[in-house]
Amino acid sequence: MDELLRAGFAALGLPLDETALTRFETYYELLDERSKVMNLTAIHGETDVAQLHFLDSAALLTVEPLAGKSVIDVGTGAGFPGLPLKIAQPDISLTLLDSLDKRVRFLGDVCAATGLTDVTCLHTRAEEAPELRGQFDAAVSRAVARLYLLCELCLPFVRTGGVFLAMKGPDCAAELDEARSAIRKLGGTDERTARYTIPGTDVTHSVVVIRKTAPTPPKYPRRWAKMQKEHL
């Protein structure tokens, strides 16, 4: 895994020191071990995890500078993209949010085993965390949901002037068109869409960069069922 990560980070133009390498190795070992008894990821094996989880997540740092920023990862699952971002950029102040308690406990175990600090692991739903409203420089998400839904879940967490980075597949133009009304109503502007190929693979992903230009109206986010039923 070391050589894959060294080559991948070099291809992305990102630094990678020995501490980060050790942390990635520890993260992989825990992920591999726990995936045998709980549903954490469908991606297995050193090569695929290194490329499709670790490098894919770290590639966000080539899209938007996050050094010294407060970042919330919404619907983080097994910690992607948040934990690889934190390992690659340790001065990020990170909050990991997930609705499943056993995943949140796993994330806490990873932080303890890797020695990561300034990481908060929260067991809650995004629409049920009003105390976090407007508290972050950036929100990130690789969750599998339509962009308009992710925007309603994530943009309320972002301070005005901050950014929401939504990780998507190679072609998200139609999904972005579908979300533009929601982005505007939630106080955002779709600034640009960045694309990258994961080093060592032919997999191309997109990141929709949404700038928070105004406060999100207090009535958002709505309950999940209403979000799905009544498209913004």
Stretches with model-predicted labels:
Residues G75:
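Conserved glycine-centered beta->alpha loop in an early N-terminal alpha/beta scaffold
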Residues M1-G68, I72, K102-V119, R223:
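Class I SAM-dependent transferase core
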